[in-house]
Amino acid sequence: MSTGEFLYEGKAKIIYRTDDPDILLAQYKDDATAFNAQKRGTITNKGRINCAIATHLFKVLEAAGIATHFIDQPNPDQMRMRAVQIVPLEVVVRNIAAGSLCQQTGLALGVPLSQPLVDFYYKDDALGDPLLTRDRIFLLELTTPEQLEQLRQLALRINQILINFFHQCGITLVDFKLEFGMTSDQQLLLADEISPDTCRLWDDAESDPTRRVMDKDRFRRDLGEVDTAYARVMERVLAQDIYVP
């Protein structure tokens, strides 16, 4: 599919306009970043792999009643999507202690949480995407109390759907990041992507704490075999039928 006018370039995707103002085209990139883009690199075929994974997972979520911005996948590394105004909050759902949760609380890596934890981060690269309390979200007027609760409930629904789906893939969903956006007619949609870039995924067949990692932590922590891990996730995800859990 030919691309239209360049709109903007992010860390993982280039976004183009199309003939329809309500539809955008995302070109997924092989670029990899970590630590707020302080670390940069390239992962072989990451664009195609992440686009394929995100496409399949959006279809799974749509089948389960979650409205997303996904339209179709015209090429292996391209996704057509509905244009949205992104809510400036990153919604992180955690099922197992890892990453910044361990650093900030002293919880040991791998400790299962008694219930999913939903965190909200300010989507602002200049500030380092800080963790926000509910009161700070309202102080900054980033959303309303009603929409914040809607985001939380949607995130928890998506979490349960994805936990079940990844279980069928032999993968544990440790935690993941979501972004949402509003359409021109004020419909709230799941946006951005769901992929090894945005999720922590552990291989159920591996007990070794290094070998089990199937996500961007392999890049962050210089564990090697990043492209191989991403490809394994894609193979397992695409092998699963799209169904209503």
UniProtKB/Swiss-Prot annotation:
* GO BP field: 'de novo' IMP biosynthetic process; cobalamin biosynthetic process
Keyword set, alphabetical order: ATP-binding, Ligase, Nucleotide-binding, Purine biosynthesis
A Pfam family annotated for this chain is SAICAR_synt
Q: Which InterPro entries match?
A: SAICAR_synt/ADE2_N, SAICAR_synt_PurC, SAICAR_synth, SAICAR_synthetase, SAICAR_synthetase_CS
Coiled-coil segments: none
Among its keywords, does the record have Protein biosynthesis?
A: no
As recorded in UniProt, its EC number(s) are 6.3.2.6
Pathway connected to this protein: Purine metabolism; IMP biosynthesis via de novo pathway; 5-amino-1-(5-phospho-D-ribosyl)imidazole-4-carboxamide from 5-amino-1-(5-phospho-D-ribosyl)imidazole-4-carboxylate: step 1/2
Instruction: Give the reaction(s) catalysed.
Output: 5-amino-1-(5-phospho-D-ribosyl)imidazole-4-carboxylate + L-aspartate + ATP = (2S)-2-[5-amino-1-(5-phospho-beta-D-ribosyl)imidazole-4-carboxamido]succinate + ADP + phosphate + 2 H(+)
**Which class of enzymes does this protein belong to?**
ligase
| Record GO terms (molecular function) | ATP binding; phosphoribosylaminoimidazolesuccinocarboxamide synthase activity
Please state which protein family the record places this protein in. Answer: Belongs to the SAICAR synthetase family.
HAMAP family in the record: SAICAR_synth
Protein name, as recorded: Phosphoribosylaminoimidazole-succinocarboxamide synthase
Species annotation = Acaryochloris marina (strain MBIC 11017)
Gene that codes for this? purC
